[in-house]
């Protein structure tokens, strides 16, 4: 009898141990919520033209940690500030590499740039080099005279339109402004210069963005995807974009044959000097291909995003006259009757900064952060994320998360009053520039461009809707692409402010 009790007790203990082990094992390897898919294509059919919106809708059903099978690629989608914080802060080192994607690989001379390079010693040395030589605070401040000059040209042009009571296409105006600033700072050539004075340059940039934002089967379906890209014309489009950009870089190099003194150099001068000094990056010396890859980042990363933000901000202000009046009152009270706004003046404009943050919240230029590649396994919300998983953070969804933001669909800059939230990468509610090791190195330049550009537009002019148009007519639909701009161009009528 005693042996039966002992045996029963032993079986009971074994049962408890097995149950505990099972619970522990189940907690470690819980199945990540995932929508059902089809063979070969997986969940690709569930992605619409505006992928961030499609993923946002799916996350409402499957949660802030969601696994998709995009073709043959396991892809993790994070849609909340808390899960983004875990990935980009707590486990940044586990997932800070990049997948090698066909478009980026082609244009970056086989991933020689900062954006698409995998995480390795080469990337770390390149990032350090660019941070010191190209994106330091001193370097950014040194190009302020260029911003002053280009903004003055824009203000003078708008003043002429105002005197004739002509409407202004702000989408084109902001794009021309940022293009002029970037080209002059980086290449030493005005947008009106001989190399850039044509529709060809604008078309080159537009076509490149469109190509990079197009669906590439080779990124999702190994072995046969390239065949699809070849037959639908994408492969040829990639090669043409590469040839056109490469020819543009060679034109820029031709304009920099004469050396300049240190201190008067543009960014190309700096890079060519470093090449001549035989600076070592990774396992080899800095070459022309390295320089071209870096210029690709500056060209595509610096032009579009700031223009998009300024356009969305003005569209929201036009839709919200109360906010428009309030931000203009702040600017005009602070600036008084000065003829021009200086860079230092923008530091005083707290409400303008709130307007810009609110614009980034609702309209992040890059709604899905560039994909990361998981290097080593880690855990989010109890789910194990395996190595070789592709990871996306849906910044657009985070900006509309009702658990983070009250009335998330409302444009309400006051929500940032008495708030420490900013877009510098430490607050995961607002990730316009990313976070962690892969944060955008042009954060400071982009922020100052937007602040300075908008401050001048709102100081010098009142803005009215074209005749016959009402607030409800302002279309806020998004255009698909790698970056997400306003689908219809923003056209407003400037009225010169006469108190200065």
Swiss-Prot record:
It is a single-pass membrane protein. The chain crosses the membrane at residues 1-21. Keywords: Heme, Iron, Membrane, Metal-binding, Monooxygenase, Oxidoreductase, Transmembrane, Transmembrane helix. One of its GO terms (cellular component) is membrane. Its cofactor is heme. This is Cytochrome P450 71B26. Heme binds at residue 440. Pfam families: p450. It is found in: Membrane. It comes from Arabidopsis thaliana. One of its GO terms (molecular function) is iron ion binding. Its EC number is 1.14.-.-. Belongs to the cytochrome P450 family.
């Amino acid at each position: 009898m005693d042996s039966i009790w002992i045996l029963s007790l032993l079986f009971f203990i074994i049962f408890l141990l097995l149950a505990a082990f099972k619970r522990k094992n189940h907690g470690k390897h819980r199945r990540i919520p995932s929508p059902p898919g089809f063979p070969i294509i997986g969940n690709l059919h569930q992605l619409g033209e505006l992928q961030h919106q499609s993923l946002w809708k799916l996350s409402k059903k499957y949660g802030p940690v969601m696994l998709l099978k995009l073709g043959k690629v396991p892809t993790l989608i994070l849609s909340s500030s808390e899960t983004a914080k875990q990935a980009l802060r707590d486990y940044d080192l586990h997932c800070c590499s990049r997948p090698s994607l066909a478009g980026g690989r082609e244009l970056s001379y086989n991933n020689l740039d900062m954006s698409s390079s995998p995480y390795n010693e080469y990337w770390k040395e390149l990032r350090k080099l660019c941070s010191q030589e190209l994106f330091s605070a001193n370097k950014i401040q040194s190009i302020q005279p260029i911003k002053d000059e280009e903004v003055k040209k824009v203000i003078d042009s708008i003043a002429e339109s105002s005197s004739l009571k002509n409407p202004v296409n702000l989408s084109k105006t902001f794009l021309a402004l940022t293009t002029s600033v970037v080209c002059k700072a980086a290449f030493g050539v005005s947008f009106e210069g001989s190399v850039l004075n044509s529709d060809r340059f604008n078309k080159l940039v537009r076509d490149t963005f469109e190509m990079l934002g197009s669906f590439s089967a080779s990124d999702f379906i190994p072995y046969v995807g390239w065949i699809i890209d070849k037959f639908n014309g994408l492969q040829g489009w990639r090669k043409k974009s590469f040839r056109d950009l490469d020819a543009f870089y060679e034109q820029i190099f031709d304009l920099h044959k004469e050396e300049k003194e240190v201190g008067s150099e543009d960014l190309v001068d700096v890079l060519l000097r470093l090449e001549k000094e035989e600076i070592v990056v990774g396992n080899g010396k800095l070459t022309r291909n390295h320089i071209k890859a870096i210029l690709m980042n500056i060209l595509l990363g610096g032009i579009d995003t700031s223009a998009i933000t300024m356009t969305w901000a003005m569209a929201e202000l036009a839709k919200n006259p109360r906010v428009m009046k309030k931000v203009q009152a702040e600017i005009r009270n602070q600036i008084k009757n000065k003829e021009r706004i200086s860079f230092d003046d923008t530091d005083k404009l707290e409400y303008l900064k709130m307007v810009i943050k609110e614009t980034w919240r609702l309209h992040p230029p890059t709604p899905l952060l560039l994909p990361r590649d998981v290097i080593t396994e880690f855990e989010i919300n109890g789910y194990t994320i395996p190595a070789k998983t592709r990871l996306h953070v849906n910044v657009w969804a985070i900006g509309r998360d009702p658990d983070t933001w009250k009335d998330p669909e409302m444009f309400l800059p006051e929500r940032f009053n008495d708030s420490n939230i900013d877009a510098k990468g430490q607050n995961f509610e607002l990730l316009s520039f990313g976070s962690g090791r892969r944060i955008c190195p042009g954060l400071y330049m982009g922020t100052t461009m937007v602040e300075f550009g908008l401050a001048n537009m709102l100081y010098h002019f009142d803005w009215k809707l074209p005749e016959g148009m009402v607030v409800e007519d302002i279309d806020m639909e998004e255009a698909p692409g790698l970056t997400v701009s306003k689908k219809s161009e923003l056209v407003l009528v400037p009225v010169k402010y006469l108190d200065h």
